[in-house]
Amino acid sequence: MLRDGNEGMFTIPGFSQIQFEGFCRFINQGLMEEFNKFPKIEDTDQEIEFKLFVETYQLAEPLIKERDAVYESLTYSSELYVLAGLIWKTNRDMKEQTVFIGNIPLMNSLGTFIVNGIYRIVINQILQSPGIYYRSELDHNGISVYTSTIISDWGGRSELEIDRKARIWARVSRKQKISILVLLSAMGLNLREILDNVCYPEIFLSFLNDKEKKKIGSKENAILEFYQQFACVGGDPVFSESLCKELQKKFFQQRCELGRIGRRNINQRLNLDIPHNNTFLLPRDVLAAADHLIGMKFGMGTLDDMNHLKNKRIRSVADLLQDQFGLALVRLENAVRGTISGAIRHKLIPTPQNLVTSTSLTTTYESFFGLHPLSQVLDRTNPLTQIVHGRKLSYLGPGGVTGRTASFRIRDIHPSHYGRICPIDTSEGINVGLIGSLAIHVRIGHWGSIETPFYEISERSKEKEARMIYLSPSRDEYYMIAAGNSLALNRGIQEEQVVPARYRQEFLTIAWEQVHLRSIFPFQYFSIGASLIPFIEHNDANRALMSSNMQRQAVPLSRSEKCIVGTGLERQAALDSGVSVIAEHEGKVISTDTHQIVFSGNGNTLNIPLVMYQRSNKNTCMHQKPQVQRGKYVKKGQILADGAATVGGELALGKNVLVAYMPWEGYNFEDAVLISERLVYSDIYTSFHIRKYEIQTHMTSQGPERITNEIPHLEAHLLRNLDRNGIVMLGSWVETGDILVGKLTPQIANESSYAPEDRLLRAILGIQVSTAKETSLKLPIGGRGRVIDVRWIQKKGGSSYNPEIIRVYILQKREIKVGDKVAGRHGNKGIISKILPRQDMPYLQDGTPVDMVFNPLGVPSRMNVGQIFECSLGLAGDLLNRHYRIAPFDERYEQEASRKLVFSELYEASKQTKNPWVFEPEYPGKSKIFDGRTGDPFEQAVLIGKSYILKLIHQVDDKIHGRSSGHYALVTQQPLRGRAKQGGQRVGEMEVWALEGFGVAHILQEMLTYKSDHIRARQEVLGTTIIGGTIVNPEDAPESFRLLVRELRSLALELNHFLVSEKNFQINRKEA
């Protein structure tokens, strides 16, 4: 697709556009395609016919708003109606009714779905494109074996291979292979037709012996031979019509369905002209594939690169939703058939509405969004995370690879990724290279290809007819694309004579006159995360990868601040995330408060509600703050309210703080960070977190559970925050152990469940004491905070399957503390090791104390020098009150451009502020600073500046854990693992060696017995500790040893052990 003029040349497409386009394609095309496959349904006697008039389908307006769907834990969906007809063939009577097919979840303005009140997103999957691929592999003798692989639309594979004697075999499974002549005969060709339609008939005749002639003597023989190999059946099967139909269905229709994309690819690869609507493998395809394979054997033709993007396709949200819709219609068809036959059997008169149930479609989509690996809960840590999540690209999932089986070649960067898939942004760990991110300019083409725009350079471009062209990966090899050229579109600027360029997957240096296309934007090759890193060209790629991942983990702060040094993409990232409120047209602000903005324009008055302390699924606080004043006039597109982590419509994930790169008493050893107490007391890095606690009331066999504030046997101060209904009051401050919701569960009354005083009351006074069990919702450890919302969701019907749900939301204010993780935008991460009083921090020559001290040894070995440029330029920007937005790769315009920019700005800041220490020519960028404890200057000059530092979601409050008592595993009798289960720390093999090395025998014995799995000994410890007695050494073996003995017994091995007495060394036999 070509676009005339410079329109859109520097306009970045919406970051959620790919999701929107995919869903629109599903609604406009996918639904109709699947409806057209729905067959006419007849009963067994062919008296009644049921059909859908699919041209008249309707999608109704959603019954609830997005916000209500989230609040009430419902699905934001639309009801699908279609006209259905029931025809009685005997009298040609027809009954038409509009039937309700089911609910289809709708995409909202964020490009996500709301299912059961939870934001979910569908990830794009990248798969091998259906078609035919030629490869060469070495066999065990080191001889090249040429194979052609035919991949079907659903991922099934069939292979043709040619051996040393030029015989061609068809391999339908890994073990079984048959002659290609048998396959072609089974597909309906005779020998004469085969030989007439191939280029090398003599090769086919060369491996035709008497045995082969007998196999392909008739179509029946060929089908029997093929069925025997394909179905792996023994004996001699007999030819029958049912066998022929089974083979036709299982192999030729299922295994060999190419789909529209597969048919197009095979036509292009084999130079065929078969119509696109013929989506199954034909004998003509197999003959052409065999001819190409023979050509490969003798050195003609080119092999295919399986990892080239032209051989991949994107399975977008449209394809996944369409597949599920087709599956639901198949289920609906089976249900209608069953209902029709049941109605006729019981002599009932069916109607279309009685035949169609909505459960097929609704349950299919519910299970898809709930269980499918490509449907994920939207990560809403911050606005950047939301938009990046929708642009992920996964090789995993159904039909793809797995993290354990994927080869290095699949994970690696390929030249065809240039401008399409970001070479930097991928996950770390086992899925590295398998989960990528789309570059910012790409779009998904009609055939599932990834297209990227380039600016065309032609003779006509001199006549002001510049064009932008979207290039698919299959067309790359026809063009020379300039890679490192400057982006000036002004014709007057003379381009370099020689430029680096890309041609046929190689990077060359060519003359400017030979270039066909040039890149349109410096960020064109990167994803959003990588495009937000300033001076990325000065960083090692591994650190840039860490940075793009860590920006997604940044916590929105209570007082956001935009970065001094940025890349210019911050505004669009904030805009497309949907967290800000933007004026849709110009008008006047009538009133504004924290809850809503009343805005008049175009003759209408709009009430715009603002998000107030909304919890994200990562427990961060999503909040909108009005940015306009009453009575002000606003223009279209102006920011009315900022969201979490945005300032003035720009992304603001962190804070600009004064940093120094120097060692300080070992407190910044191994990436630790030393910070000033100013960051705590001035709420610089304070963030709000909202935790959700919920409880359900069920209908038990003894009666319903009750919500009440009258709970026996509990101290009054634990119930102090409950209202008369037994639910915590809004605005209450709650501590660990407090009751949030009081609940009593009825249980069977038996004598053993009564306390002694209850039995006395019942015997003397005849008072019936309640036997309900207390099952209240208590605040767990680390949950203290302020109650900001309570929701009581009462489902209709109130049955045991639809329990009432009570949710309590508690707001926590968290200052930065020792153990929290902070990071810059260059992969420079660290843990807070010490918080110093501000008077002890190093201070500058004007007396300003430093906020953070980083280790200078973290820079040279990691090669992320971009942080040094950002740090120094940030200092200049702070002193000059300027903000910089710098595109990457500025060295393309001038050598050392970044360094010159930074030094010139520092020099100007030094002149304007009359502070010569800001830029000292002897050590530019560095300055002499003073020790806050002694007032003496440090020996060497230190690099100081303003860096943009983020606080990450990995906080010590969520990680720190100690176990006093807790649960034990049933088999090993050892403490469980993990903070959530109140687990313990494992003393493993290597820890035991370490303790042995120090000779601490008693500590080691305690860890392996009392504190772990010696059941009797650990019970005795408590009693002896309370009375102050001595803890006796256990004389029998711990449970883990007894478990080993029992496991050996199961293998018929008896193991006895003996304990040697310390007194007389007599051996006492002890049974295990």
Swiss-Prot record:
GO terms for molecular function: DNA binding; DNA-directed RNA polymerase activity; ribonucleoside binding. It is found in: Plastid, Chloroplast. Keywords: Chloroplast, DNA-directed RNA polymerase, Nucleotidyltransferase, Plastid, Transcription, Transferase. GO terms for biological process: DNA-templated transcription. Its EC number is 2.7.7.6. It is an enzyme of class 2 (transferase). Pfam families: RNA_pol_Rpb2_1, RNA_pol_Rpb2_2, RNA_pol_Rpb2_3, RNA_pol_Rpb2_6, RNA_pol_Rpb2_7. GO terms for cellular component: chloroplast; DNA-directed RNA polymerase complex; mitochondrion. InterPro entries: DNA-dir_RNA_pol_bsu_ext_1_sf, DNA-dir_RNA_pol_su2, DNA-dir_RNAP_su2_dom, DNA-dir_RNAP_su2_hyb_sf, RNA_pol_bsu_bac, RNA_pol_bsu_CS, RNA_pol_bsu_protrusion, RNA_pol_Rpb2_2. Its main location: plastid. SUPFAM superfamilies: beta and beta-prime subunits of DNA dependent RNA-polymerase. It catalyses: RNA(n) + a ribonucleoside 5'-triphosphate = RNA(n+1) + diphosphate. DNA-dependent RNA polymerase catalyzes the transcription of DNA into RNA using the four ribonucleoside triphosphates as substrates. In plastids the minimal PEP RNA polymerase catalytic core is composed of four subunits: alpha, beta, beta', and beta''. When a (nuclear-encoded) sigma factor is associated with the core the holoenzyme is formed, which can initiate transcription. Belongs to the RNA polymerase beta chain family. This is DNA-directed RNA polymerase subunit beta. The gene is rpoB.
